[in-house]
Amino acid sequence: MDAKNYESQAANIVQTAEATLSDNFKNIDNVALLNQRKVLNAFTNNRVSARHFAGTNGYGYDDVGRETLNCVFADVLDAESALVSPLIVSGTHALTLALFGILRPDDILLSVTGDVYDTLNDVISGNGNGSLKDFGIKFDKIELCDGKINLSEICKYLEITQPKLIYFQRSRGYSWRNALTIDDFGNAVNVIKKISPDSLIMVDNCYGEFTEECEPTVCGADIIAGSLIKNAGGGLAPTGGYIAGRKELVELAAKRLTTPSTGGEVGSYENGYRNFYQGIFLAPHTV
């Protein structure tokens, strides 16, 4: 067979594959378009302009770039409030700020998606390293069942114990399972809230942003956290992370990032915020 025939065969294979998957591609485009509309509305409603891209130094009081970026993320993620900062070095750091901000000695943290990331495991259960365990915070976990949230075991647990915080990991991480869908999460939260209405719901949202039409905040998450190096940064944010959710919980996390007296009121960034704004603007399509 000559080269032209090979080219023709290859072209036919590609065309057939694209035709077979056309509905899937259309669904992906629809999700991207819907999320892009959210981002555009957030930029418009917060009157984002070139002045928000400028860098600052010193304490960062009244840093309009930082404060407006927080508002944009809150709107895009359907949250009351958001903390977005280049000083958050990773997703694990963002999650750690939220955990240490919310939890107190003798509180119980329950993971309903089994083991957490290795880097977060030492945050929760490390010995002598300033972990949650060192501060008297208890940790329990319920393993997934065939890659799905084990609602029956969760119900049994909650009938006996009322944890302060219930933790979901949305992505598969390093395990061989599918990522949790928003429907999976929403169904689980509905069940949990009927049994333990006072338990707070936290979601590790890393790799989950813009993959569906809405975020976990719409389906009952009290607080979510993620990295700007992944989806939400659109491939342009050079560093950073975010925390979003109920205003009082986000502020508790902000007090761990800075100080209990200043919270989210401070934090400068000399290099400026253009890449962060441009990253979130492009993220729906990039993801």
Region annotations inferred by a language model:
Residues 70:
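Generic structural marker for isolated residues within well-ordered, non-membrane alpha-helices
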Residues 66:
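N-terminal pre-P-loop "Q-motif" helix
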